[in-house]
Amino acid sequence: MEARYNFKEIEPKWQRRWEASDLYRVTEDPDKPKFYCLEMFPYPSGNLHMGHVRNYSIGDVVARVKRMRGYNVLHPMGWDAFGLPAENAAIHRGIPPAEWTWSNIANMRRQLHAMGISYDWDREVATCHPNYYRWTQWLFLQMYKHGLAYRKKAAVNWCPSCATVLANEQVVDGACERCHTPVMRKDLEQWFFRITDYADRLLEDLKKLPGWPDKVKIMQENWIGKSSGAEVVFRVEGSGEEIPVFTTRPDTLYGVTYLVLAPEHPLVEKLTAGTPYEGPVEEFVQAARYLSALDRTATEKEKEGLFTGAYAINPVNNERVPIWIANYVLMEYGTGAVMGVPAHDQRDFEFARKYDLPVKVVIRPASSELPAGELAAAYVEDGIMVNSGPFNGLPNREGIQKVTEYLESIGRGRARVNYRLRDWLISRQRYWGAPIPMIYCDQCGIVPVPEEDLPVILPEGVEFRPTGESPLTYCPEFVNTTCPRCGGPARRETDTMDTFVCSSWYFLRYTSPHSQDRAFERDKVDYWMNVDQYIGGVEHAILHLMYARFFTKALHDFGLVGVEEPFQNLLTQGMVLKDGSKMSKSKGNIVSPEEIINRYGADTARLFILFAAPPERDLEWSDQGVEGCYRFLNRVWRLVGSYADAVRRAGGSLEIRSHADRELWRLLHATIKKVTEDVEERFNFNTAISAIMELVNGCYRYQDTVPEEEQNLVLMGEVLRKLVTLLAPFAPHITEELWQGLGGQESVHRESWPQYDPEALVEEEITLVIQINGKVKDRMQVPAGLAREKIEELVLNRDKVAALLAGQQVVKVIVVPDKLVNVVARRAS
């Protein structure tokens, strides 16, 4: 071994060897238990950031440990490669999106190789490659065939200045992030997936995921937003129109003093046409188009409304109820109409107070009256129904069911379950995405592209114009085609799919990435799925994870996969911070992984990122912490180097010859136990590394305190080999070199994970704490497992204890074996 730890030579050397030997390539093996370890694949932005390093280092430790424990491990990597930044590069730099993307992929692949992550690169996928998006398109057609894909008008974010559609992420404080023009809502024909058909299953099956963090499951529950209640039908006075309203509180129906419609509600125009209210209402509707859904529903946002001049009839008491429009009601939720019950809903109360609308109490506390004129806030607790006709005196919870039954009996309502979850809008007016494989024919209508004609290839040389339509619209060789049914002239769909569609099935493609005739091979999917451990940021808790679950359930129903949940266990790692803030260019606090690797090596970077904090917590970057990890690896290098030649030459069988031998042997097995449990059961990589550091300290202690001629080289060889094996998943390059130095022939990563010996953990001696009247006075070494009577005898006969007890009478002696003795004494009378 070289005297100096030279990571600049060691790391590239072993990366080349791993690649040449296909060390991490994997195939199906029915004789081994399988383990599918997956980190969320990245968008190829061009460079890895520290969040990537953390994510992939965590996954790599899990994958490497599982391999060493005898599992057949699938650990793939790929690229979520479609998306808006590539189009921005085309617009601002004149670089074609494909060229920009593939260049970024090449650079990030190089950086991942430099990190030493144990990926099976033979399974690499990129969602922008025709071999991949051909099957994304095929899956869209399966959704369409089964009635889960459909087209309808929907509102999108529209920037009038750029004349383009914006994604939600591009709307900042209600304005376009590029030009700061206020963004408005505009209706366009869009494609949707019917994810709401799966709302109940998506909700219920969260119970089947004990390996997911509770916070993620709660976020999904809230996003699905299941609520039970009633749909109440209000008739519009003087017309045949009806307004269905969903409410979770039918018990408050007698307290309705107004109705509110969303500004986009189709009835608004009908109700106001030709009336004095038409102009002001139209102005209000236009103003609402410049507010995002988030702005309109924010609790701190002022609620604005306007009377339409129309009235509805309350079905339970036939009272006239004024119909308003308001900015806080969304067409996307429920029916786009809500009933105003100001006495029992705080938002309604504030709206009624602002516009001087009546307040009618219909629920009072069980033990007191509740005059409407004295209300300072809405009464939202349970109570007794009042002013509610035949339901007076009922507990309101009972009234919910009774009022619903009454509505059903008169044909003016029904029990209903509502969801916050909306169908998934997948259309994007973008170029750099998977083209939606549909054709429009004047004779035949909407026609799917035949499966044998896939993929619908993205054309090159497209012009990017800020028109609000996909750039594909202005590419006649793409748009103009023939109808597959009648052979007449037809037009291709020019929208592309939301990039979340591509990432909703990539974990299936990894199981058979080279398949030419299908999206994935069923036998291989059945072997590898579910993903045993999925790792990624909590920011993906809702959209990506929800969509992937939906896709898997739909494909299961189509008979294409055998599982209903894609990810058995989920780890959401925290962010990497610097100076207390998330790393970002704007804050000037970015630390480049490449710079750290060039200065300290990949093993140091990995070790620090795993050691600095538990994975689920945010990690504060520390230059001193990186230096400390680098010094530790140098200590390990020197330790192994100082023994390598001697332990290779040492012969004979292992014997424990001294107390020092016994302590080192015990420490080794305690470390194996601790590291195994921390990595496999708790993902406490930081405490696992800490235990390895303690073992290194123990080895140095042995080296420093045991005379050289008395040192047990067979034992030290065994300890160092186990030490290197334990460290290997965390620091894979240096451990290969150390393993070779200790005489290893194969890769250390082919070694079996060490097993601890329970008998080796038994301590020969323990330190016994001695208390007198509960206060620690002394300590002594005694043989482990000593009987209570013997412990009591040794303590009471100890000189220091006898002196402390002089003049006192021993009342009793409390013995906690192998831990402490408490002598209870009082002054002798």
Curated annotation (Swiss-Prot):
It is an enzyme of class 6 (ligase). Signal peptide: none annotated. Belongs to the class-I aminoacyl-tRNA synthetase family. One of its GO terms (molecular function) is leucine-tRNA ligase activity. It comes from Moorella thermoacetica (strain ATCC 39073 / JCM 9320). It is found in: Cytoplasm. CDD domains: Anticodon_Ia_Leu_BEm, LeuRS_core. GO terms for cellular component: cytosol. A motif ('HIGH' region) lies at residues 42-52. This is Leucine--tRNA ligase. A motif ('KMSKS' region) lies at residues 582-586. GO terms for biological process: leucyl-tRNA aminoacylation. Transmembrane segments: none annotated. It holds the Pfam family tRNA-synt_1_2. It catalyses: tRNA(Leu) + L-leucine + ATP = L-leucyl-tRNA(Leu) + AMP + diphosphate. It comes from the Bacteria. InterPro entries: aa-tRNA-synth_I_CS, aa-tRNA-synth_Ia, Leu-tRNA-ligase, Leu_tRNA-synth_edit, M/V/L/I-tRNA-synth_anticd-bd, Methionyl/Leucyl_tRNA_Synth, Rossmann-like_a/b/a_fold, tRNAsynth_Ia_anticodon-bd. Its EC number is 6.1.1.4.
